[in-house]
Amino acid sequence: MNKQVRNTTEIVRLAKLKSQKTREKVDKAISKFCIEGFAINFNSIAKERNVSKSWLYKEHDIRQRIESLRERQITSNVVSKPKKSSRSEEILIKTLKRRVMELEKENKKLQNQIQKLYGDLYNKE
């Protein structure tokens, strides 16, 4: 006597359609961020396309894509120091040698002052 027939196929179809549209929005956002050089992370993608971060984390393929792009950006942002030329190394060595000599002279001067003060103190007693 139950005349209600549940038709869930349409609900399932609409849910899949919504999910597909969301995927397309996220893919467009990721592509846009790659082209324009923006930081790619879950927060920025979620804000750009108005999707929840939990949905991004739940979808494994999208999650892996964002994580790999984020890692690639981090490694590309690490800037290696330019190698010093032999000329700049020579200048640095000369500067450091000069500084060492100045410090040695100052040290010698201070040691002489200490010896003099010890002598004065000893003669006082």
Swiss-Prot record:
Disulfide bonds: none annotated. The keyword DNA-binding applies. One of its GO terms (biological process) is DNA recombination. Keywords: DNA recombination, DNA-binding, Transposable element, Transposition. Pfam families: DUF6262 (PF19776). InterPro entries: TnpC-like. It comes from the Bacteria. The keyword DNA-binding applies. GO terms for molecular function: DNA binding. This is Transposase C from transposon PsiTn554. The lineage of its organism: Bacteria, Bacillati, Bacillota, Bacilli, Bacillales. The gene is tnpC.
